[in-house]
Amino acid sequence: MTPEEAYRWLAEHSLETAYLKSMGHLLGWDQRTHIPAKGHPHRHNQFAMLAKWIHARATDPRLGEALARVEASDLGTDPGAVTAVNVREWRRDYDRAVKIPQELAVALAKATAEGETAWERTRPASDWETFKPFLVTVVALKREEAQALGYAAEPYDAHLDLFEPGETAAGLAPLLEELRVSLLRVLEAVQGSGRRPQSEVVRRHFPVDGQERLAWLAAQSLGYDFAGGRLDPTAHPFSVDIGPGDVRITTRYNEHYFRQAFFGTLHETGHALYDQGLPAEHWGTPRGDTVSLGIHESQSRLWENLVGRSLGFWRFFYPRVQETFAVLQDVPLEVFHFAINEVKPSLIRTEADEVTYNLHILLRFELERALMNGDLQVAELPGAFNDKMCAYLGLTPPDPGQGVMQDVHWSAGLFGYFPTYTLGNLYAAQFYARAEAELGPLEERFAAGDFAPLLTWLRARIHSQGHRLWPRPLVREVTGEELTPQYLVRYLQRRFRALYGLPAGDF
């Protein structure tokens, strides 16, 4: 087999594996939106079978042989070329996969599917004791996985590197600490301002049918292609890339809280815009894939927060909201805009404001790092979670459902995932600042309903690039700088200085 033949075989193998993963994504979407209650056991078996097939393909010895042939040639000499990008990521995936025994891969697939189902069943009643054994199993298997994969400094790094290539806990912790200090200063200034929004205006009665129409309109306005997607209700909102021409979003409606579904929709739309902008001609290979969860999150946060919470956006969209909901016809734009940007520590991460959100992430980062490193046991988790909530946000969850059980991530085995939310916020602010430097002020365009220039900019610099670069190098290429918390901090200072009447200068 020549190097060229080996590369073609690798590309075909990658494409076939991508189809299997696509089937899993479709099954996962169905499980979280439409599956009948009695269908879960069979679905778990389906996931386990898919995991078995995918793992077998990922550890096929022929992959190693073909990679060796290509790597010994000049096909990968240009690090930016499509072939080099694909070979780099195939090698990374293969080396990771062969370290995980098939039995462990299958056990993890089944345990996480069962764990997520158990979470959905027990969370409404805050039934920690029933849920706990499922989480114990998942944590034990994830610890075993970290040992199988290996790591440079600590077990947690093995999981963090999966979601954010090149990132380590030691490299991330200083960024989070610098951000934490700045966020607490902003929070202190806001709480000391004495100015408070009329928060009740977003807690009036908003019938679901009206919210559905607005969610659809908002997603379409930002550029989401409904001919290649759909919007459905779910318990825990997500987006999913089934494949080219099929990128779906979901949201969760609350008739008495406007922000939940609307901003959840903007968030998932941001994810979907990234997936819809990937180069379809490279689908099934790394060059056509996303960079990382953090970069993915940067796209959702950028559209949800930097765009969707801006005054410019609401100058365009608020008249449509008032047309839909008569209960807001007596509420001026500025009052509504202040209400949707209220800063107030909350129990629920997904309902947190922009200032306190990353404090939620920091405590989860510290807890899951301790869990994976063996410094914290599952039985100790509820108490540890409550202690950190009190220390960072001044709140104590009254029950596990509003505390340690509020997120699906750990039951699904997604350790190392939470930090990507904060990385996404950091990336988003830095990308947005660069976009404005190149395009000029964007809020004036938003007020006119013109979101295309920003989307086009993101398409060219991020979406179309696929997995050509890892996160930190991509940030350097797009912005010309290393990743820094300062852009996020400055953005938050500007926004909340205006809303809360704070003095000029840093705080």
PLM feature spans:
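A well-structured
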Residues: 1-165, 468, 493-505
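C-terminal, non-catalytic "cap/extension" segments appended to globular domains
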Residues: 2-6, 22-28, 38, 42, ...
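Divalent metal-coordination and catalytic microenvironments
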Residues: 10, 150, 267, 300, ...
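Secondary-structure capping and boundary motifs in well-ordered enzyme cores
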Residues: 42, 104-107, 134-137, 175, ...
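Contiguous, non-catalytic segments that form substrate-binding/exosite surfaces or channel walls
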Residues: 108-258
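Acidic/polar loop patches that form or flank catalytic/metal-binding clefts of enzymes
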Residues: 227-228, 280-285, 309-319, 378-379, ...
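Active-site recognition of the HExxH zinc-binding catalytic motif
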Residues: 260-280, 297-301
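Post-HExxH zinc-binding segment in Zn-dependent metallohydrolases
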Residues: 289-333
